[in-house]
C-alpha cells in the first residue's frame, strides 16, 4: 500500500494532487478520546525557576498578540517557511493551529495533554510522568 502522512498546509490542498484521505488523525483523536488534539508544546526544564518560565510564557503571548494585530508583518515570514504559497491556504493553516489554546490551554487543553501522556505511558513509550504547566501571571 502506498501511503503517507499529510501535515501542515498540505491538509488543505492534498486533493489537488489526486491524493485521498484514508483517515484524518486529528478527527480520529478527537472522536477516540473526546479531547482536543495536542499538536505541540513549548517546554521548559523543570529546574527553570517560575519567574524565568513566566517570562518565556509572557513573551510568547506577546508575540502571538502582535501577530494577530498586524498579520501583514508576519505573512512574509510565513511565506518563506510555508509548503503552500497561497495566502488563503496559509491563513487557514494559521487559523487552525494558532488558536485559543495557543494563549491559554484551559481545562480542555490540560485534559488533552494529560490524556496523551497517560496513553503514551500505557503503551510503554514514556515513563509515568505528569506535565507541569507554567503558572499564570
Outline where the language-model segments fall.
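Pocket-lining segment of extracytoplasmic ligand-binding domains
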Residues: 1-80
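Short secondary-structure transition/capping segments
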Residues: 30-38, 113-124
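Generic structural "secondary-structure junction" signal
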Residues: 44, 50, 103, 128, ...
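Secondary-structure end/capping motifs
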Residues: 49-119
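Conserved C-terminal helix/tail region of periplasmic/extracytoplasmic solute-binding proteins
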Residues: 118-137
Amino acid at each position: 500500500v502506498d501511503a503517507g502522512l499529510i501535515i501542515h498546509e498540505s491538509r488543505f490542498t492534498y486533493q489537488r494532487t489526486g491524493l485521498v484521505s484514508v483517515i484524518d488523525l486529528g478527527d480520529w483523536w478527537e472522536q477516540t478520546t473526546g479531547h482536543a488534539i495536542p499538536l505541540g508544546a513549548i517546554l521548559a526544564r523543570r529546574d527553570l525557576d517560575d519567574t524565568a518560565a513566566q517570562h518565556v510564557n509572557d513573551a510568547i503571548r506577546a508575540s502571538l498578540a502582535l501577530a494577530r494585530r498586524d498579520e501583514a508583518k508576519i505573512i512574509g515570514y510565513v511565506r518563506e517557511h510555508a509548503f503552500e504559497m497561497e495566502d488563503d491556504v496559509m491563513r487557514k493553516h494559521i487559523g487552525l493551529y494558532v488558536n485559543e489554546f495557543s494563549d491559554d490551554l484551559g481545562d480542555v487543553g490540560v485534559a488533552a495533554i494529560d490524556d496523551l501522556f497517560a496513553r503514551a505511558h500505557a503503551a510503554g513509550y514514556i515513563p509515568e510522568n505528569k506535565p507541569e504547566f507554567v503558572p499564570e501571571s
